[in-house]
């Protein structure tokens, strides 16, 4: 990545935010950089990124940290359970960021987690403030 890392935000309506971040990840892995993607909304059910990430190890680590989509796709979990998972995801982010093991960390759907009230904006600001200088940090999600 770069000598001074960036904070990049992909937001807006429609599709393409996660895809853009994955494009950055693929490029980084091509340069033998270490990448971690922490997904705030997607749960552990099977989806394409899981299969792709296995092919990119050890340079790419995917952590599906969410409980799953909130209030859709047959979700019956109480909001408090989604909040607990999101708060645990924030702790995972802190650990990964402070480990200085990664060149690029993607916080997928973190913006949407804030919008839904699963985490507060201050916790996101703290992640940004505490990132190592060389780390590229990508935040995705609508809102």
Model-predicted segments: where are they?
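Phosphate-binding/switch loop-helix module in NTP-utilizing enzymes
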Residues: 73-133
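Short, polar loop motifs at secondary-structure junctions
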Residues: 142-143
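Proline-centered loop/turn at the N-terminus of a beta-strand
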Residues: 34, 134-136
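Positively charged, low-complexity intrinsically disordered leader regions
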Residues: 1-2
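Conserved P-loop
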Residues: 5-95
């Amino acid at each position: 990545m770069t000598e001074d890392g960036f904070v990049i935000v992909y937001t807006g309506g429609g599709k393409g935010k996660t895809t853009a971040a994955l494009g950055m990840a693929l490029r980084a892995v091509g340069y033998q950089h270490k990448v971690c993607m922490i997904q705030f909304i997607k749960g552990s059910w099977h989806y394409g990124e899981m299969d792709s990430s296995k092919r990119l190890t050890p340079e790419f680590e995917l952590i599906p940290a969410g409980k799953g989509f909130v209030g859709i796709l047959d979700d019956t979990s109480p909001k408090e359970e989604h909040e607990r998972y999101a708060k645990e995801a924030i702790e995972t982010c802190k650990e990964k960021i402070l480990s200085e093991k990664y060149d690029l960390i993607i916080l997928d759907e973190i913006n949407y987690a804030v919008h839904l009230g699963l985490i507060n904006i201050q916790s996101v600001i703290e992640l940004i403030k505490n990132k190592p200088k060389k780390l590229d940090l990508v935040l995705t999600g609508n809102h």
